[in-house]
Amino acid sequence: PWFISAAVCGQGEPEVPSGVSYPCVAKPVTLSASRGVIRANNDQELVAALSRISKIIESAGPEHPRVVLIEEYIPGMEYVVEGLLDSGNWRTMAIFGKPEPLEGPFFEETIYIAPPGLGFDVEKKILDTVRATCEAYGLEHGPVHAECRINEDGVWLIELAPRTIGGKCSRIFQLGTGQALEDIVILNALGRPAPFRPPAGVIGVMMIPVQGLGIVRRVEGIEAARCVDHIEEIEIDVKPG
């Protein structure tokens, strides 16, 4: 897939770089949790996306470069790979499926489920792609977080970073295995044995994105939801008021 990097200065209307085709996705070269990841289907939408991303980068702080990556949009279902490298030896921690189609224009995190119900051959293709990328980058030790899409043309790597899964998602490892993901990563960094038990059964997390502006007055039904079978935790990040 093609990709182009472009600077966004925050002054005046951004220009569309040459070589862009549609649909495409624009995103900051830093940040996480899908902040500032926006699909564009034409020049007008791309200009609006670049303007919006510029403001997001500015609000995130001066340590974030004002650079945007514009890349080809890859259709398909999305999967997340969590792995651990120990002196070049790969260990798969989990493969998560994202069952909801993520077609844009925004790509809010919603549902992660492991195992994703893929066959052995498909999982092998995903892991082979991630491992090959780690080797190309020279990654040899530490956690790996990767996101891929799969369509009729094969497996496409969307992102890869030497870090653990973000936000509250790491909690599902402890809920599913009794082990904190952070403990395993620290033991591995210290060169000590870091035993890991694969999750027993199916584990998952659902994040509910905010659909618009407003003020939270109250959240109802939490206790009833906690009584539903297999729900282990409910957390509300936005407080009333």
Mark where each language-model region is.
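Conserved ATP-binding module of the ATP-grasp superfamily
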Residues: 3, 26, 39-76, 106-112, ...
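Conserved N-proximal alpha/beta basic substrate-recognition cap immediately N-terminal to
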Residues: 1-19, 31, 206
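Glycine-rich active-site loop/lid that clamps phosphate-bearing ligands
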Residues: 209-240
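Short beta-strand-to-turn element immediately C-terminal to the catalytic PLP-Schiff-base lysine
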Residues: 37-42, 84-86, 151, 175
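Acidic, glycine-rich loop-and-beta core segments that form the ion-binding/anion-interacting portion
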Residues: 95-140, 148
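ATP-grasp fold ATP-binding core
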Residues: 20-40, 57-76, 81, 95-97, ...
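Active-site "cap" helix and flanking loop/linker of ATP-utilizing ligase/carboxylase catalytic domains
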Residues: 124-146, 152, 161-217
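Conserved protein kinase catalytic/activation segment
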Residues: 154-156
